[in-house]
Amino acid sequence: MYYPLLSIALGSVLGAWLRWFLGLKLNPIYPQIPLGTVTVNLVGGFIIGFAMAYFAHSDLNPNYKLFVITGFCGALTTFSTFSIEIVTLLQSGKWGMAMLAISIHLIGSLIFTCLGLATYYWVAGH
């Protein structure tokens, strides 16, 4: 019971530290498009794709999958989870569902970000 939790926790710590470090080092280079954020999203997408394929053909203990995918990639970027879900839909020939999911994720995230900002300003009385 504790090994899955520890696997996720350790992966999360390392993923979060890497995200923070890359943000510190890369975001100031070109602030209009934060390169640290772009980097973690692209690297996270690559890692989760590689890991999903690898673990599908591996006899390794499932805790390693939890460490890499749920922990590390989850903390590094949630974009990697989104990416693998969309690719899975596309591989299944569900193009319409993939496009719908992309639209919901992207537009929905922007809307909810705006709602979060508006809620703060409303609650704070600004």
Swiss-Prot record:
Single GO BP term: cellular detoxification of fluoride
Inhibition and activation profile: Na(+) is not transported, but it plays an essential structural role and its presence is essential for fluoride channel function.
Organism taxonomic ancestry: Bacteria, Pseudomonadati, Pseudomonadota, Gammaproteobacteria, Moraxellales
One Gene Ontology cellular component: plasma membrane
PANTHER family: FLUORIDE EXPORT PROTEIN 1-RELATED (PTHR28259:SF1)
MF GO annotations: fluoride channel activity; metal ion binding
Source organism of the structure: Acinetobacter baumannii (strain AYE)
Residue ranges of coiled coil: none
Name of this protein: Fluoride-specific ion channel FluC
Reaction(s) catalysed by this chain's protein: fluoride(in) = fluoride(out)
Keywords on record: Cell inner membrane, Cell membrane, Ion channel, Ion transport, Membrane, Metal-binding, Sodium, Transmembrane, Transmembrane helix, Transport
Membrane topology field: Multi-pass membrane protein
Residues at which Na(+) binds: 74, 77
Record-linked InterPro entries: FluC (IPR003691)
Family: Belongs to the fluoride channel Fluc/FEX (TC 1.A.43) family.
UniProt function note: Fluoride-specific ion channel. Important for reducing fluoride concentration in the cell, thus reducing its toxicity.
Cellular location(s): Cell inner membrane
Chief place of localization: membrane
One Pfam family here: CRCB
Residue spans crossing the bilayer: 4-24, 33-53, 67-87, 97-117
